[in-house]
Amino acid sequence: MDFEFSPEQQTFIEQVEAFLDANDDPDIFDVTRENMAQIVDTPKRRQFMAKLGEMGWLGMTWPKEYGGSEGEGVYEYLLNERLAGRGGPQIGKGVGIIGKTLIAHGNDFLKDEFLPKILRNEVEFAVGYSEPNAGSDAASMRLKGVRGERDGKTGWILNGQKTWTTSAHFAEWYWLGVRTDPDNKHRGITLMLVPLDQPGITINKIDTMGGVPMGDERTNEVFIDDVFVPDEYVVGEVNSGFQYISQALDLERFTMFTYSPIKQRLDVLVDHVRTETVDGEPIKDDPIVRQRIGQLATEAEVARVMGLRVVSESMKADAVPGTPPPTVESSEYKLFATEFSKRLADA
């Protein structure tokens, strides 16, 4: 595995850094928002993402026929690392999870409707997979879709609930997993696009154990009652949604789960240890503290290398036809980095 970036990639990094310097704004970049910094939930953040589109950085890996530049996936990773390092909104959901799935599996109507808007950042999506009894096991989702007709159109009538939908209160469209075959767990899920501003959709704020939603941020539960979805808003084949979801999650795990926030938290901890005292004694001189910091620094380096491994394997999959994506490696990285972030927070 080669973890060195090419001269072209180094040039791109420099271009991104210069662009971010020129567009620095505390209303856009805020590292204190931590994991919630990546969402595009304010007018200024939406305007900033539109500027990324003007630079040609939304859809860098898309085919040219859909407005992309057919670049390597590593460029999306490099862009997100720089955005995450400053606490800025990141690409991945619209461009990656939704855009790439539409390119691969969407009908012409959906491609024409959404792909140009994604490249210009004119539409915001919420992703609806998780349910009260379907979290890590997304294939257990039960939000029900049955065949129906309304206003002369055929489609699906939806009823059920989703939870932990972070963007539902400001997004325009719902990227929704629906149970369309109750007898087949993995081959009974269909992806649909649903407008959120319609009767039958109720969005409620979720409060966490601290009494506030996700710190200073918000997540939601969404109730769907007799909502009709025309057939043209079904993504790909009926009952093939879980396959599409799995493919998209491979992308999310290495483009949206970045290393920079981990490094920031470790640096804050190290700075604290360097300056604080207990009973007049510097805690940096405590051998137990030093051992713990060394262990955390080692684990942070492991997380960095695991992420780069996924990037390297993804580049190989892009370059060599027939090479499978690093599904296992990306899952390992996501799990390790998440668990390590918890250990770092507890330290």
Predicted regions and their residues:
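Hydrophobic, small-residue-rich alpha-helical packing segments that form membrane-like cores
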Residues: 134-137, 156
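Buried hydrophobic positions in well-ordered alpha/beta secondary-structure cores of metabolic enzymes
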Residues: 9, 20, 56, 63, ...
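C-terminal helix-coil-helix/basic helical segment that borders enzyme active sites and/or dimer interfaces
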Residues: 28-38, 278-279, 287, 301-347
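Internal helix-loop-helix
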Residues: 46-124, 167-173, 300, 314-329, ...
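Structural signature of FAD isoalloxazine-binding scaffolds in flavoprotein oxidoreductases
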Residues: 70-82, 137-141, 223, 229
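A structural signal for short hydrophobic beta-strand segments in well-ordered beta-sheet cores
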Residues: 143-147, 266
